[in-house]
Each structure stands twice: as C-alpha cells, then as structure tokens.
Amino acid sequence: MRQRLLPSVTSLLLVALLFPGSSQARHVNHSATEALGELRERAPGQGTNGFQLLRHAVKRDLLPPRTPPYQVHISHREARGPSFRICVDFLGPRWARGCSTGN
C-alpha cells in the first residue's frame, strides 16, 4: 500500500513545484483595476488609445524608473588619456564606464 502512494504523492509534489503561482491566482491585482477606472473617468470614448494609456499606467506602476544611459563626451575621452581612448574605441561609448582611466 505504501509503495502505491509514493509515486502519486511524488507526482503531486512535482506538479506543485512546477506551478507555484496557481495557489496565488485567487488574489486580484487591484492596482490594474483602479488604473482602468481612473482612465475611464479621465478620457471616455478614447477607443484603442484608452487601452494604450491603461497599459502605460499599469507599466509605470509595476516597473521601477529607468536611469538614462551613460553619455561619454569627446572632452572627457581626451582628458582621460590614450588608454581610455583605446578602450572606448574598442568597446564603444556605451560601455566606456568600465574602462580604466590609466591614472
């Protein structure tokens, strides 16, 4: 009897581990429904534009603000010396933050 229950219990545990979010499906995300209500009050009859506004409002609530990319100016490149210029030329200005100044 014990050997019959072992495979079924093991498979049940495996399914529970593969789908951990299914137990939390009962909870409703109220921030999305509140954002929808606010958009309907602000701009009625917008059509698909209203949907885009809702998507951006929900996205704004869920994601942290992004920092702007690091900009390397020519004057900074020249002031840091030849090794920095070689590094920037090799990696590109986007990744120049990790280049050594050589000082």
Swiss-Prot record:
Specifically expressed in caput and proximal corpus of epididymis (at protein level). Present in the epididymal epithelium and on the sperm surface, with a subacrosomal equatorial distribution on the sperm head (at protein level). Coiled coil: none annotated. GO terms for cellular component: extracellular region. Glycans are attached at N29. The keyword Secreted applies. Pfam families: Sperm_Ag_HE2. GO terms for biological process: antimicrobial humoral immune response mediated by antimicrobial peptide; cytolysis by host of symbiont cells; defense response to bacterium; spermatogenesis. Keywords: Antibiotic, Antimicrobial, Defensin, Glycoprotein, Secreted, Signal. It comes from the Eukaryota. Its main location: secreted. InterPro entries: Sperm_Ag_11A_B. It is found in: Secreted. Residues 1-25 form the signal peptide. The keyword Glycoprotein applies. Has antimicrobial activity against E.coli. Plays a role in the defense response in the male reproductive tract, contributing to sperm maturation, storage and protection. Belongs to the SPAG11 family. This is Sperm-associated antigen 11B.
